[in-house]
Curated annotation (Swiss-Prot):
Protein name in UniProt: Nuclear envelope morphology protein 1
Function field: Catalytic component of the nem1-spo7 complex which acts as a phosphatase and may be required for proper nuclear membrane morphology.
GO cellular component labels: endoplasmic reticulum; endoplasmic reticulum membrane; Nem1-Spo7 phosphatase complex; nuclear membrane; nucleus
Comp. bias regions, Low complexity: 51-62
Location in the cell: Endoplasmic reticulum membrane; Nucleus membrane
Composition-biased stretches (Polar residues): 234-256
UniProt gene name: nem1
Coiled coil: none
Record-annotated disulphide pairs: none
Catalytic activity field: O-phospho-L-seryl-[protein] + H2O = L-seryl-[protein] + phosphate; O-phospho-L-threonyl-[protein] + H2O = L-threonyl-[protein] + phosphate
Amino acid sequence: MNSIARLSDEINKAILATPLDDDEADKEKLANARGRASSATLRHYNRRRSSYSASSLSSLSSKPTEKEVPTRNEKPKHANIMRVVVYWIRVFLKRIYTFFVHSARVFLYHFLNEEKEFTLASFFWGLCRFVFFPVLLSYKRREMLPPQPSVRRPRFYSSYSYPSSHQDPAYSSFKRHRSSNSYSSSSNGNHVRFQPSIAEEEISFNSFSNSLNSEEDVCVSPMKPKEVSLMGKANSNRSGHSHQPQSTQFSPPANDNISKLPSSFTIVNDPLKSPSSSRLRIRNITLCADKIPRPLLNSKLPRKTLVLDLDETLIHSVSRGSRTTSGQPIEVHVPGEHPILYYIHKRPHLDYFLSNVSQWFRLILFTASVQPYADPIIDYLERDKKIFAKRYYRQHCALVDSSFVKDISICNIHLSRIMIIDNSPASYNAHKENAIPIEGWISDPSDVDLLNLLSFLHALQYVHDVRDLLGLRLAK
């Protein structure tokens, strides 16, 4: 039994030992193969590494630096801009070329015949279309226009018995003899020119002699006032007429060399109608003057003076001890007394009122207050620019029945050109015809009295005598 066990053990050992020898041989073979592979791989890796290093070095040498990168990036931008500019220049030149080519083709097309061939006949036909036809069309268009008068018509500066478009037959003769200073005559009437005393304006009078068809034209220079006599009286002796137009006769100066002058010229004015330019009718008179007549009145009237009150007309002042403390504080220094603080309130729209009336009138401030009180307030009103030409105070007033009366005659202005605006009737009691009353103002913020006066004051600057207009207030 023991021998059998021993035999089995040996067999097992032999079986187990045989694979182990084969594994070791395989391991050796594998190790040798791995060694050969590793050496080949190492050699291949070294070759790849050397080639990679060479390529990397060459690429690194050719790679731009950081400083060179922006310059290369800028070049495409400039190239793009230049490309756009060149493109638009090409477009512009192409359009100019197309325009000239098209114009030349259109121009040359007029010199071709219907078969689009250039011949001598087609050339002359195109020349006629370009040169002669426009001239003929303009001539034809000129013939279609209404004919223009060949003789210059006289200028009329007023409307009289016949319309201004009427051509006076004596005007041509009057024009011929205009340069001469002596007497001249024509076949259809008497044309007289006196020696020019004033000179330049001439009046042509047409008067009927015996019938309506026969006229006598007299051309007279304006004479001195002593050579014209006015005899205007209404004829009331005729029966059957309620009124007769008033007539004014102008007698020309006597001259021994003139025998055919009419005795008088009649201007008819209806006393029942308004003496305006449309109502005034001058019979048988035609005005032929080279210049517009001079105005009878001087257009430049002297500048008028406007006197303004201070307290309760332009401003309202409140002392320091009152309830309200708003407004502009102004300290008043009265000699011999302590300074007093006043709060000044402007009347609504005062600045706008003063800025307008200062352009129309010469302004004077006349107040019944004392000078130490009034001067700081007036200076406050004139802080932007000087408004008042003069200032008058309580010492310039007259005390009448315990009231201060302002005598505006001390301003040395004629009473026809001076006005006063005051809220106290006692202040302008001496010159009521020069006064413009106004309501006193204390604290009403909706007051518009100064604005309402502007349109009236604007009209007063063109009045000859302000008393004629302001005195209507006193008429009963």
